[in-house]
């Protein structure tokens, strides 16, 4: 079941929380709505579910306008972060609940409900816990029950609001893998909200990065990671070093140090330079490629590389992060002095990416 979102806006009072959102979600895809608090991702999810109404725009499922359709008639399953299980019901009864309250003409008989719930219990690997109550379950088990309950009514679309946010790190990883395997098996259309970048990258077919009620970028996990469309996406996803510089002619100056550029750009003046820690080059000697002196503050061995925190010497106030591959130089120790640089820097003037600009291989 595909989802088509066309120019949807939402206000809470006078505050606009969604700004003309347009997004197409193909049938069978798992899509992550990723962004910081206040980005509008949960509001958009609730509009898809029918738990909120948009002020403008159109929402369609497989070409049919459902904008004014009640939530109960949308055939959407919803999984909440804090499970929302009925404490007085057993696991079996929690999963069966949605089936038992269907209109009489659609409601399965008792035998069919028992069979359906039994299948779901096996699917979520909780068949041995059918008679337990929520208070007797772990967080991960509760979330599996919540997911089975959502799937019981065979929804066209499954929506999940930070489904693993209340769980510890190891359980989150296990459930992420399990959910992805379940999606591959059942091929349902799914949209989930998260602020966990690792979760979005691991589970989703496509990632929708949101900020302040706007969509910043839509793409595969690899696309949004390697080719961020905006400065916000670049700074939001993963760790990145931001340095202040100035372009003068065909030179990029950072403090008293400079890099040659491939050509003199149209833009002259102040810029921000962004480099991922693993994009930094490290040398024991100053060069055109590595002109910036640093001193090592912290060394964290990571097997085939070292994670370094280094203090710029005279050209930047705050420490920066550097990933040093094993074998490039002798094992680093705290207090060592090196020179850093990087050819894959992205240069911004405000929110404008400066293209085409590249750091020259040599002067």
From Swiss-Prot:
Its EC number is 7.3.2.3. Residues 3-237 form the ABC transporter domain. It comes from the Bacteria. This is Sulfate/thiosulfate import ATP-binding protein CysA. The lineage of its organism: Bacteria, Pseudomonadati, Pseudomonadota, Gammaproteobacteria, Enterobacterales. Its main location: membrane. InterPro entries: AAA+_ATPase (IPR003593), ABC_SmlMolc_Importer (IPR050093), ABC_transporter-like_ATP-bd (IPR003439), ABC_transporter-like_CS (IPR017871), Mo/tungstate-bd_C_term_dom (IPR008995), P-loop_NTPase (IPR027417), Sulph_transpt1 (IPR005666). It catalyses: sulfate(out) + ATP + H2O = sulfate(in) + ADP + phosphate + H(+); thiosulfate(out) + ATP + H2O = thiosulfate(in) + ADP + phosphate + H(+). The complex is composed of two ATP-binding proteins (CysA), two transmembrane proteins (CysT and CysW) and a solute-binding protein (CysP). Pfam families: ABC_tran. It is a peripheral membrane protein. NCBIfam families: 3a0106s01 (TIGR00968), PRK10851.1 (NF008105). Part of the ABC transporter complex CysAWTP involved in sulfate/thiosulfate import. Responsible for energy coupling to the transport system. Signal peptide: none annotated. The keyword Calcium does not apply. PROSITE patterns: ABC_TRANSPORTER_1 (PS00211), ABC_TRANSPORTER_2 (PS50893), CYSA (PS51237). GO terms for cellular component: ATP-binding cassette (ABC) transporter complex. PANTHER family: SPERMIDINE/PUTRESCINE IMPORT ATP-BINDING PROTEIN POTA, SPERMIDINE_PUTRESCINE IMPORT ATP-BINDING PROTEIN POTA. GO terms for molecular function: ABC-type sulfate transporter activity; ABC-type thiosulfate transporter activity; ATP binding; ATP hydrolysis activity. Keywords: ATP-binding, Cell inner membrane, Cell membrane, Membrane, Nucleotide-binding, Sulfate transport, Translocase, Transport. Belongs to the ABC transporter superfamily. Sulfate/tungstate importer (TC 3.A.1.6) family. ATP binds at residues 35-42. The keyword 4Fe-4S does not apply. It is found in: Cell inner membrane.
């Amino acid at each position: 079941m595909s989802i088509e979102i066309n120019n949807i806006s939402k206000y809470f009072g006078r505050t606009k929380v969604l700004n003309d959102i347009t997004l197409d979600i193909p049938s069978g895809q798992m899509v992550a709505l990723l962004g910081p608090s206040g980005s509008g991702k949960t509001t958009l999810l609730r509009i898809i579910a029918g738990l909120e109404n948009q002020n403008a725009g159109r929402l369609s499922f497989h070409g049919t306008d459902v904008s004014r359709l009640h939530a109960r008639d949308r055939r959407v399953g919803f999984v909440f972060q804090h499970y929302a299980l009925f404490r007085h019901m057993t696991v079996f009864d929690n999963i069966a609940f949605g089936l038992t309250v269907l209109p009489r003409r659609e409601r399965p008989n008792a035998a069919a409900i028992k069979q359906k719930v039994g299948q779901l219990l096996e699917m979520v690997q909780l068949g041995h816990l059918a008679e337990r109550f929520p208070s007797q379950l772990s967080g991960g088990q509760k979330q599996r029950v919540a997911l089975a309950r959502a799937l019981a009514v065979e929804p066209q679309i499954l929506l999940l609001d930070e489904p693993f946010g209340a769980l510890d790190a190891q359980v989150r990883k296990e459930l992420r893998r399990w959910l992805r395997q379940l999606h591959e098996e059942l091929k349902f259309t799914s949209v989930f909200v998260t602020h966990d970048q690792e979760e979005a990258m691991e589970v989703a077919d496509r990632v929708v990065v949101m900020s302040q009620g706007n969509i910043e970028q839509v793409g595969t996990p690899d696309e949004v990671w390697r080719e961020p469309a905006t400065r916000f996406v670049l700074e939001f996803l993963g760790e990145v070093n931001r340095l202040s510089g100035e372009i003068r002619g065909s030179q990029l100056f950072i403090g008293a140090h400079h890099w040659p550029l491939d050509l003199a750009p149209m833009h002259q003046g102040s810029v921000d330079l962004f480099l991922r820690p693993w994009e930094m080059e490290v040398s024991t000697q100053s060069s055109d490629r590595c002109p910036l002196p640093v001193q090592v503050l912290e060394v964290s061995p990571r097997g085939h590389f070292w994670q370094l925190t280094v203090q710029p010497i005279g050209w930047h106030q705050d420490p920066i992060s550097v990933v040093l591959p094993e074998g490039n130089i002798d094992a680093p120790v705290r207090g060592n002095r090196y020179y850093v640089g990087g050819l894959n820097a992205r240069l911004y003037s405000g929110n404008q990416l400066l293209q085409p600009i590249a750091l020259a291989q040599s002067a």
